[in-house]
Design a protein with these regions (language model features):
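Transmembrane helix-loop-helix hairpins in multi-pass inner-membrane proteins
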Residues: 15-130, 209, 213-271
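Hydrophobic/aromatic residues in alpha-helical transmembrane segments
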Residues: 1, 13, 32, 173-180, ...
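Short, membrane-interfacial amphipathic segments enriched in basic
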Residues: 124-145
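Core segments of transmembrane alpha-helices
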Residues: 60-64, 141-144, 165-177
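A short amphipathic helical element positioned immediately N-terminal to and/or at the very start
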Residues: 36, 141-153
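Signature of the 12-TM Major Facilitator Superfamily
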Residues: 10, 44-48, 160, 191, ...
Length: 271
């Protein structure tokens, strides 16, 4: 069933809003799935589309960031220890997640064995209290991603389209500080800002804070200080972060509220 454009846009706003207010952006997809199912789109088809999009987007962020790190390696190595550690942490977390997704897509049984071993180890260490419940969650997650992976294997061009769309989306997002500079009358190179934002995103994306609040602002000031100076980097940070996160948080919150109450009392449309 084809999802109308405006309905898709409202789901995207929902994803942004709940991702922004939950640690490590964990709340976006479950709420997207909730609203899609509530609106009459089948749970299986909804989860397929969300999982496929999330899998490719995760890999796009990693590839984009790693390419920019490789192209600006000397700049990265010249940063402080905290930035380098954040970057390594981000690469490891995103790399692990992307690798696990690929493993599930192409070899679900092996991925299930690995995740069950990890769950067993965490249970023996006392980190996981309810081992059976954790195993059920792992098996359910593997099953969902395997079905999404089967779709991507059957329609590889869909993955290519999602990758291209994600790359364009990330490019637009990463260029917000550049346009903030231009708005403030500061001369800047779009290429430098694109590289810095890709590195910054990769460094803070895995920080378990809602919207990476604090980590994003602090890392922004450290990275951009060498390019703009302390005074200008603070002004650019306020404007660009205000546009790309706080303004979008308000807009997506209003859109989510509309989505929540607009269909209250209306029956779900048939699938």
């Amino acid at each position: 069933k084809k999802v109308p454009y405006w309905r898709s846009l409202s789901y995207a706003f929902t994803d942004f809003y709940f991702s922004a207010i939950t640690p490590s952006a964990t709340g976006g997809q479950p709420m997207q799935l909730y609203y899609m199912v509530r609106d009459g789109f089948g749970a299986a088809h909804s989860s397929f589309s969300l999982l496929a999009t999330a899998a490719v987007y995760q890999m796009t962020v990693l590839v984009y960031g790693c390419v920019m790190v490789g192209a600006n390696l000397s700049f990265v190595m010249g940063q402080g220890r905290i930035i380098r550690l954040l970057l390594v942490f981000g690469v490891l977390v995103n790399g692990f997640c992307s690798g696990l997704i690929l493993l599930i897509i192409f070899h679900g049984l092996l991925a299930e064995k690995i995740m069950l071993c990890i769950a067993g180890g965490l249970s023996r260490a006392g980190i996981i209290k309810n081992r059976k419940r954790a195993i059920r969650k792992v098996e359910g997650l593997i099953d969902e991603y395997s079905r999404g992976g089967a779709y991507l294997r059957q329609y590889p061009l869909a993955a290519v389209r999602i990758f291209i769309h994600s790359a364009v989306q990330l490019t637009a997002l990463y260029l917000v500080p550049y346009w903030a500079c231009r708005a403030l009358g500061i001369s800047a190179s779009a290429k430098d800002f694109l590289a810095l934002q890709a590195i910054l995103s990769l460094a803070v994306t895995a920080v378990p804070l809602p919207g990476s609040v604090g980590a994003s602002e602090g890392s922004f000031l450290v990275l951009y200080r060498t390019l703009l100076g302390a005074g200008q980097s603070f002004s650019v940070m306020l404007l660009s972060r205000g546009i790309s996160f706080y303004a979008m948080l308000c807009i997506s919150g209003l859109a989510t509220a509309f989505l929540q109450f607009a269909r209250r009392g209306k029956p779900a449309s048939p699938v």
